[in-house]
Amino acid sequence: MQHRMLGKKLIHAALVAATAGPAFAAADRYEIEPNHTYPSFEFSHMGISVWRGKFDRTSGRITIDRAAGTGTAEIVIDTTSIDFGLDKMDEAARSEDWFNVAKFPTATYKGTLTFVGDFPRTVEGQFTLLGITRPVKLTLNIFKCIPHPMFKKEVCGADAEGDLNWSEYGMKHSKYGEGDAGRVHLRIQVEALKQD
């Protein structure tokens, strides 16, 4: 009788492990490659030209569950690394009127990947800038994974874009660009290396 009960318990445990194991193993984790990831943006300058800038330091992680067709993204942007290609502009952008990096040295994005077929096509997320969080949707124009020739691991890359408005985040500079003039177009190149 005891042997029979023990046998049933072992079978039950094996079934639970077989069911839970693949679901847990299906989620792959990727670390952002900071040397290949640059959130960039562009916006109208008084309606007569377009200014473009980027952030040079970014970290974070991405998870992908291909079996379930889901994933997540968590990105941390070092706002002190703002780069317009012009020192005076960079200095102004770090000031209280713009990104106020002394008080808010980072901006964050946390989102959920939506798959169409075998690949993620959009990210529905929350972007926090200057302590204010607003929804931002990103469209993935490119998403591809390949074996990395140097690291011998899978690396995934994407090109994403979306839109936001300075004024929604309380940026003081936005007083010069309210309404449509405050619109900012995001272009984000990202690469992430699979973790063991």
Regions found by a protein language model. Name each.
Residues 2-12:
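Bacterial N-terminal signal peptides that target proteins for export
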